[in-house]
Amino acid sequence: MYQAGLVLEGGGMKGLYTAGVLDYFIEKDMDFSSCYGVSAGAIHMCNLISKQKGRGLRTATKYLNDKNYCSVYSLLTTGDFFGVDFCYRKIPMELDPYDYETFSKYTGKAYAVMTNIITGKAEYYQIKDLKKDIIGI
């Protein structure tokens, strides 16, 4: 494991470039002692930690035209442009199963970075149990 922090930016579909770089890290079996992900970067970080090469590109392209994934329909019906239930429950638990077991074996630290809507400041949420922590966010 590299004793280094990896910071992964957000940016929606622009994050697919990041996903490609992380796929290379998976190929080379590169692990980092700490990872920080913002928005799409947090999603791709989880794919890196679970060693699911190709998952970032696959899920983004496969569901891109699904109105439940990201759309005005989702925004109007759920209040979120990205359908939270579809993206964080249906895809990883049914349609493209996430490898929670491999993630749970990660010995480094993983953080999802988010903005506190009251203070406007960044907050770092450590992800220990991916299934519980992500659904809870």
Segment roles from a protein language model:
Residues 1-38, 46-137:
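Patatin-like phospholipase
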